[in-house]
Amino acid sequence: MESFSVFVNNVDSLVWSMVLVVLCLGVGLYLSIRLKFPQIRLMKEMIHLLMDKEESESGITPFQAFATTVGARVGMGNIAGVASAIFYGGPGSVFWMWMIAAIGAASAFVESALGQAYKVKNPDGEFSGGPAYYIEKGLKCKPYAILFAIVAFLGPGFLMPGVQINSLVTVFEEAFSVNKILVGAICCVILGIVVYGSIKRIAQIAELLAPAMCAVYILAAVIILGLNITKLPGILKMIIQSAFGVHALLGGIVGSAVSWGVKRGIYSNEAGMGCGAIVSAAAECSHPAKQGLIQSFSIYVDTLFIGTATAMIVLLTGTFDVADAAGNLLISQTGGLESGIKWTQHALISTFGTWSGKALAIIIVLFVFTSMTGYCYQAESNIRYLTGNSKKAVAIARAVFLAASFLGAIVNADAVWAMGDIGYGLMAWANIIAIALLAPKAVEILRDYEKQKKSSKNPVFDPAKFGIKDETGAWNRKKDS
């Protein structure tokens, strides 16, 4: 097992080189400039669209797509992932997580709008789309599209699920002293019952759970903030100084702060990976820009709200350590407590008492549940693309997904996180380049949306106007929405 951990960590380092970090930041900034920072200037429109009740017969509603995506994004990357970023990159990694969220929201807009624009209607009446579709139809490069679809199955379908289950069984073992394998088995049985339902069923579950789990977790962070408000200025100062290498103790790991902040930021919000595009393509709406804006807002919910909540919980309570690249502790405050989910758990216990550790375990169930159902849909969507909607292939893909999930209860945390990083990294490599190349099309889509809005119209998308062939009738709407 040790040799396996060494192998996956070496692959992880290769995939997540500084080149990918710069690419994610650079493309996000490029798209923000090309689109004139829609993630800032159209914030009011995002909230309006989120509240709009748009009915759907063929797909899921825009809010369900938002809830499903938030459910998939808000997972262990926001809790255990943020904590590990602080351990390896210092508090400064939090600043770079904020930065990748701020500019990554533009990447989220582009991929989700493109996912909608190039979506197809399946024989069962539901929609499919995402990077594989806009790469094939937009860039007209079938081999590239197939490559992405393979990577996008391996990521959510095999490499990434173990992270969620590993964190879940760890927190349950800590809170209730129960066997990890037993918890993992029960979790996989429940997942099996759910994932064999349709996307509408997944969307309905996510719509109910996602807002509730976010609200409870943020409330806990707000209470901790209130109890430690006098420490806040010092913590914010440490974050900024560490981010730019001017902190007395942490100045030598500024590179780690940037790389781990971007790495865990993308792990938590998935901006630029294409995951959000896959789910948003399943929504039925009158214009692709609507889903683009809604998915941009989900980045804020994920990183700026949930990710920041975790950072404040561990930093304000002093439940964190920081290590350099060689593993030497630069800051040691936890008494050797393993970084990750246990930091958050012990921070809550130190504030609210032992019951809060058990409460966190229950909240983690919700985070993991919605993340895993989102992963399953993303993997399944790409299998459908590769096999032409083969029911047998989908059934096999679901079985692989459940088996990979159970491995998370068996394999050590270090190896599981490295596998997850590889999955996210490969998807980022494949998708970031594609959305940069398709930026002009995204600019046209947003301009069309804003032009119609200025004419006091409910924007309606005409794919022919953009040179997009709607061969399956995905945009043949029976009614305006």
Label for each model-derived stretch:
Residues M1-M76, I86-S93, G104, A436-S481:
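N-terminal alpha-helical transmembrane segments of multi-pass membrane transport
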Residues S3-F4, L35-Q39, N78-V82, P91, ...:
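Transmembrane helix-loop junctions in multi-pass membrane proteins
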Residues L23-Y30, R34-I47, N166-F172, N179-C187, ...:
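Membrane-interface loop-to-helix entry segments
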Residues V27-S32, I100-G125, P131-V195, I363-T373:
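Helix-loop-helix module between adjacent transmembrane segments
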Residues S32, E111-K119, V222-M238, V246, ...:
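Extracellular/periplasmic helix-exit of transmembrane alpha-helices
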Residues F37-P62, S84-I86, G90-P91, W98, ...:
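Flexible loop linkers connecting adjacent transmembrane helices
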Residues S56-Y88, L114-A132, E136, P143, ...:
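Alpha-helical membrane segments and immediately flanking helix-loop junctions
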Residues I103-E111, A185-I199, A210-T230, K263-I266, ...:
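Selective recognition of specific alpha-helical transmembrane segments in multi-pass small-molecule
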